[in-house]
A protein has these predicted regions:
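Juxtamembrane intracellular "pre-TM" segments in multi-pass secondary transporters
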Residues: 2-3, 187-218
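Conserved MFS/SLC helix-loop-helix module at the cytosolic interface between two early adjacent transmembrane helices
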Residues: 59-98
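Cytoplasmic helix-loop-helix junction between adjacent transmembrane helices
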Residues: 103-144
């Protein structure tokens, strides 16, 4: 199975759009300790810049998705990117932590469009294994972000200070606007658009809320993402402040998790075609819980080894490469007419889960790995229970691509 030239172009462009949100997180992670010092605030308050970003990132997807079902996919992308540019400029000029938190919220509100709408576009174009293949390819592009972004951020921070990160994000958003205008086609033609109706949106929400399979799959993937968000919020303080790494060394070890995620995601389509996506997800979530519980047990027993932490986190995030993409494909496959709304609602649930876990972890943060590993284990066990409650039955033969 190979992509056409147009499909390859769309995959690359959608992947770049989808990477904007993670890139806006990962580039400034190495600067969190220095931001706390520069703006004279605490670690917990500094982590609020992540929490508010994730909150807006999740909640605002619920706006972009339904609107894209009604007026097309491209107009909401223009609106979101404009908001992101405004928020990035505000962050670059932030005189205090309150200002930075507020404009990070605006940033998140803008970049929410780049999460909800690309997944809806994939559903416009494909279902089944072809959708899994395209989603995995996009996840590959997204996953390069954790390898490049911290290194890029470290270089900018060392050379020009942490504010330069937000200047670079502003430039990247303008490039994305150009790609949107010149390269991305409209995949929601007028004849397929839903009427602009609050009642229709309410009925669509009702349909999704009553679909236990949709909710279970979305939250399974969301709990996987939540463990990633907890790592994002805690890792720079643990690696730099606790273990004494430099920002550049932190970026390297941070990128190892992306390597595991990328490597496993490349096998998602092959494994789904052989075993079925449900069996793939159940197997991956079982190993996810297994490695997370081992990590928690060792940390709780007082094992303060950087090598052990890095190795087991690599295993945990390798499992997520086989969970996050396939669960979203399975969740959306029966909701084609509501693809934008379903993608947005699913994204909102996932981001809200991640934001809540960050807030919960920050309450117990000690600059050691224990609160982080406990939160990751909680996410993993919960995902395991949800996955087996949702998918613990015989799956039909693997679906052919459309």
């Amino acid at each position: 199975m190979t992509f056409s030239r147009a499909a390859k172009r769309d995959t690359i462009v959608l992947g770049l759009f989808s990477a904007i949100g993670p890139f806006a997180i990962d580039t400034y992670l190495p600067a969190l300790p220095s931001i706390a010092v520069d703006l004279n605030t605490s670690t917990a308050v500094t982590q609020m810049t992540l929490t508010m970003y994730f909150l807006a990132f999740g909640l605002c997807q619920i706006f972009y998705g339904p609107i894209s079902d009604m007026i097309g996919r491209k107009p909401p992308l223009y609106i979101g990117l404009a908001l992101f540019i405004f928020g990035s400029i505000g962050c670059a000029l932030a005189p205090n932590i309150a200002w930075l938190i507020a404009f990070r919220f605006i940033q998140g509100a803008g970049t929410a469009c780049t999460m909800a709408i690309p997944r809806a576009i994939i559903r416009d174009l494909h279902t089944g294994l072809e959708a899994t293949r395209m989603m995995s390819s996009i996840m590959l592009v997204i996953s390069v972000s954790p390898m490049l972004a911290p290194l890029t951020g470290s270089a900018l921070i060392i050379s020009f200070g942490w504010r330069s990160v937000f200047v670079a994000l502003t430039v990247a958003a303008f490039v994305s606007l150009a790609l949107l205008f010149f390269l991305l086609p409209e995949t929601r033609p007028a004849e397929k658009r839903l009427p602009i109706s609050l009642r229709g949106m309410a009925l669509g929400f009702g349909q999704l809320v009553r679909d236990w399979r949709f909710l279970g799959l979305t939250l399974t993937g969301g709990l996987g993402m939540a463990s990633l968000f907890v790592f994002l919020a805690s890792s720079s303080f643990i690696y730099i402040s606790h273990f004494g790494l430099t920002p550049t060394q932190f970026s390297f070890f941070f990128a190892l998790n992306a390597v595991g995620f990328i490597g496993s995601a490349q096998f998602a389509t092959t494994l789904a075609g052989r075993f079925g996506m449900a069996r793939l997800v159940m197997g991956a979530v079982s190993f996810y819980a297994f490695f997370a519980l081992i990590l928690l047990a060792l940390t709780a027993a007082g094992v303060d080894s950087f090598a052990v932490l890095v190795l087991l986190l690599f295993c945990v995030f390798s499992c997520l490469g086989l969970i996050i993409g396939p669960t979203m494909v399975l969740a959306l496959e029966h909701h084609g007419p509501l693809a934008g709304l379903a993608s947005a609602f699913g994204g909102m649930l996932q981001m809200a889960t991640g934001g809540l876990m960050i807030a919960l972890t920050s309450l117990f943060f000690t600059k050691t790995a224990l609160p982080m590993t406990a939160a990751i284990a909680l996410c993993a066990v919960s995902a395991f229970v949800l996955a087996f409650a949702t998918l613990g039955h015989r799956e039909p033969a693997p679906q052919a691509a459309e």
